[in-house]
Amino acid sequence: MSKIIQQLEQEQLRTDIPAFAQGDTVRVQVRVKEGGKERLQAFEGIVIAKRNRGLHSAFTVRKISNGEGVERVFQTHSPLIHSVELKRRGDVRRAKLYYLRNLSGKAARIKEKLN
C-alpha cells in the first residue's frame, strides 16, 4: 500500500524548482485567477523557513511592502507556482529565521554568501 502512495507522490514532485536554502532571496511567480483571467504575480523576499516533507514540502518567504512585513507560505510542489527564481544566496547559521520579524531596516539585512 505505501509503495503505491510513494510512487504516486514521486510522479507529482516537481523537478524544475532550483535548490535554495534559508536566507536566500527568491522571486516566486504565482498563478493568480481574477475573474476569468489568469496572470502571474511575483512575490520576492527572503526565505525564512523551509519544511521538507516530500510532496508536502513548504517554504515561507518574507518581504517588506510599504513599510509592513508580509510573509507568505508556499507549497513547494504546488501547481499554482509557475517558477522560483534564485536572486541571491544568503549566509545564515539558523534553520528558521523568525528573528527577522523583530528587526527592521539595515538590521534585517543578511550577508551574501561569497562562494
Swiss-Prot record:
Belongs to the bacterial ribosomal protein bL19 family. GO terms for biological process: translation. Gene3D superfamilies: 2.30.30.790. This protein is located at the 30S-50S ribosomal subunit interface and may play a role in the structure and function of the aminoacyl-tRNA binding site. It comes from the Bacteria. Keywords: Ribonucleoprotein, Ribosomal protein. This is Large ribosomal subunit protein bL19. Signal peptide: none annotated. It comes from Aeromonas hydrophila subsp. hydrophila (strain ATCC 7966 / DSM 30187 / BCRC 13018 / CCUG 14551 / JCM 1027 / KCTC 2358 / NCIMB 9240 / NCTC 8049). The keyword Methyltransferase does not apply. GO terms for cellular component: cytosolic large ribosomal subunit. The keyword Ribosomal protein applies. GO terms for molecular function: structural constituent of ribosome. HAMAP family: Ribosomal_bL19.
